């Protein structure tokens, strides 16, 4: 029977499905320039969500093809799937997106088989792609030399990256000035100075980005030039950024995914890795929309870390969650979040609602203020990789999710997020200046989320974290909702003097009612922090402020949230 088993046909059908997915993905991506040039901001948001949802949609379609095309008993004969893998390897070897094709195959395998049938013999737990490939080319870039004139250098760049600029001469003068401010004088005068830019433009939300590097014979600097569309005034170059930390934030895990046409994804990711060496390739793949492959690279990094270190899982620092239990590896910059079997009495959500909320985050504009998540099923870890106290707590609070099978710990379902310092813990150790900066950014995070039609729900300090760049980011999603679903109210005046002394409200409260006047004691036990936040962001305590945001959203307005400092604006 083995010699007649349709391994090649199954492999071909899986790859045909991948080609179909890539074609639809590219079609959405290639529309980004037109949407940007025509200022179709709401279409941009819809396209971003559609492209994210496309992957699972296409996996489902190909699963149906396979089940319709082959006898189920034959198709699900897992012992034969090493033959499918071998046939598939031969098919993808000549491709320029072969690493993505491996991840696609894995997704199809997991859609057909239970996770206890996963093995490297049947699927690509470890990649088969060589680090250096015979078909690998230099990245698709353009190189520019100043030839004694920085303005001439900038002009040459914008000659190649042609848009309907509103006032290009003004832009060129400003960018030349910013370039001189960014680099030491000797670098600006260095005859060996050059600029290398990736040819395709990156698009995201209301911006377009030219991405590359400045370099001479000794050093290099990342280079990003954001373009904005000023409605009625044309396209303008908004800034010139060479600071690695700022460029890293532009590619942050808190941002929506870029739309950029990359026929050879590994080339571009390697190019980005050269200018952002602190970024893991999983994050770089994710940042350009290949979030499933980012998940594959994350998993490979995790199993490599577990195999090569003595690190053990511990409970994550901070206040224990009422809905989620969170654990981490000290040497691996990630937290693992599982849903508890029983929630605290004050929580009215159920498990299905929590899952929906976390999945919602993937498809909305996170405006740099919500951590991206990856959802996993059936993680298996060596029992010896858990500290006993950590494993005991997980088994106690989530026995339906965490189980011990011999020497293996099975985690049936979890999310991963980037690890941050919880804001409440950060403030306990912060200097006066750091407290001021953190509370300023905390309020700004709430405002930016709200303007993007996201209401965090539970805005306690413990539900926000501080990144390595000092940015405040929201990461607890079990109570998020669209801002337009919330009914913001003023507290009605008391009917009688006794009302104010009562422990019960004298007014009715609906399920979606929120009273911003109640925020101060709810958010801040520390009176000094409460007064400081009121001075910085007191409008957040006014129901009319929130209603004004809702009105803007209902009018179709899309806010500007810049992932970089806007110098000279």
Curated annotation (Swiss-Prot):
InterPro entries: AceK_kinase, AceK_regulatory, Isocitrate_DH_AceK. The keyword Cytoplasm applies. It holds the Pfam family AceK_regulatory. GO terms for cellular component: cytoplasm. ATP binds at residues 316-322, 337. Its main location: cytoplasm. The active site is at residue 372. This is Isocitrate dehydrogenase kinase/phosphatase. It comes from Pseudomonas putida (strain W619).
